[in-house]
Amino acid sequence: MKLYGSDFSPYARKARVLIIEKNIDCEYVADDPWAADSGIPAKNPLGKVPVLEIAPGKFLFESPLVVHYLDNLEGKPLSPTDAAGYWQSQWWQALGNGMIDATIARILETRRPADKQMPEKMRREEARIARALSSAGGEYAGGEFLVGKKLSLADIVMGVALQYVDIRYPHDWRSGQPALAKWHAGITARKSFLQTMPAGFTRVV
């Protein structure tokens, strides 16, 4: 099994963290989908990462599907098995994925020529991130993990999302959410996060 992804992609990183946490035998292959010689479009018609090759010539794509497949390998998912815990985990994942989407939308706007940038769009994405942080802080009940008493996909997705905010939209969100910041410091100290941190960036605590 092979996972194709970009080192800077938070979508691929979710899968990479999960692979390490579950000790899954899966080769990681770095492939920038923006490169002219990228092999990603031949594996995923949408041209995005991550792409998971589950058998020769058989590919899964889109991070929710890839993560769901990996999490359910060998019948030992990190996702809670009780209904309440499962849907709570899904809530956190939706919030984290939305934060990633907003952060990417903001950074893409900043890369446009200065005379073509839309400040109102940047402010809208920043407001989405701020509301998500406030919602996360209000929902977090304390403890080592977001849902229950063990690591779940909620921790992985939110951990990656908040660290992506640190990388692509660095600002002091921690002073307003000290409890969430403490949780994040603990999660991102795990081997899976340290080993998948994009080169050139330092973990913020």
What do the PLM-derived regions correspond to, one by one?
Residues 20, 167, 189:
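Short polybasic/polar patches that bind polyanions
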Residues 1-123:
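GST-like domain detector, emphasizing the conserved glutathione-binding G-site
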Residues 52, 64, 129-132, 137, ...:
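Aromatic-glycine hotspot motif
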Residues 67, 71, 90-93, 133, ...:
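Non-transmembrane alpha-helical segments in soluble domains
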Residues 175-205:
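Long hydrophobic alpha-helical segments typical of transmembrane helices together
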Residues 71, 161-162, 197:
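Active-site-flanking alpha-helical
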Residues 96-185:
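GST-like fold's C-terminal all-alpha helical module
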